[in-house]
Amino acid sequence: MSIASQIDHTALKPHTQKADILQLIKEAKEYKFASVCVNPTWVKLAAEELKGTGVDVCTVIGFPLGATTSETKAFETKDAISKGATEVDMVINIGALKDGDDEAVEADIRAVVEAADKKALVKVIIETCLLTDEEKERACRLAVSAGADFVKTSTGFSTGGATAEDIALMRKTVGPDIGVKASGGIRTKADVDSMIAAGASRIGASAGVSIVSGGDSGSSDY
């Protein structure tokens, strides 16, 4: 499997413009990335431009804080899928997890899983930099219980990104049948190799072109 085919080619900055998205799409076609990951406002354009290319359209839900209501996340999910999204990366209710309210966290994830209705992969961002190891494990177990397809480390907008240690912990927790996505701070092929060796099955990065061409990007997040 090629490195490119494991990368979600990502542009999530708030000031991203149409020209940036079109460039992202062009690169995704050229390098055959797994998907482009864009904010919901760009899903329709990305879906139109990528139709028939084999490149998926990924978007983000409850992003980047995870603090919207479950009903809002469900609506966002349905809306994104109606516009052509085939993968959604949702942020958990981080405060509820830290409060020990597992029932609320699982219900929040399940709301998105049910809204996706198997029409899109659901990746669950747990924001590892804000969690203890016990909380990371608990978040992963709740994501699996709620029916998610992937667990994911980070938004790229908080205090830290992916680490190989967190990927290994997440992989150990979810087992072999659930995807694990590393995101945040991944800039080089060495970073990617480290994450894959630790158990990642997908990489989120804005530096995809640099990674696959062997360069080094100065961008530390999305």
From Swiss-Prot:
Pathway(s) it belongs to: Carbohydrate degradation; 2-deoxy-D-ribose 1-phosphate degradation; D-glyceraldehyde 3-phosphate and acetaldehyde from 2-deoxy-alpha-D-ribose 1-phosphate: step 2/2
Q: What class of enzyme is it?
A: lyase
Alphabetically, the GO molecular function entries are: deoxyribose-phosphate aldolase activity
Alphabetically sorted, this entry's keywords are: Cytoplasm, Lyase, Schiff base
- Record Gene3D superfamilies: Aldolase class I
CDD domains membership: DeoC
Catalysed reactions, semicolon-separated: 2-deoxy-D-ribose 5-phosphate = D-glyceraldehyde 3-phosphate + acetaldehyde
Q: Name one GO biological process term.
A: deoxyribonucleotide catabolic process
Q: Where in the cell is it found?
A: Cytoplasm
Q: Its biological function?
A: Catalyzes a reversible aldol reaction between acetaldehyde and D-glyceraldehyde 3-phosphate to generate 2-deoxy-D-ribose 5-phosphate.
Q: Which protein is depicted?
A: Deoxyribose-phosphate aldolase
Source organism = Bacillus velezensis (strain DSM 23117 / BGSC 10A6 / LMG 26770 / FZB42)
Q: What is the lineage of its organism?
A: Bacteria, Bacillati, Bacillota, Bacilli, Bacillales
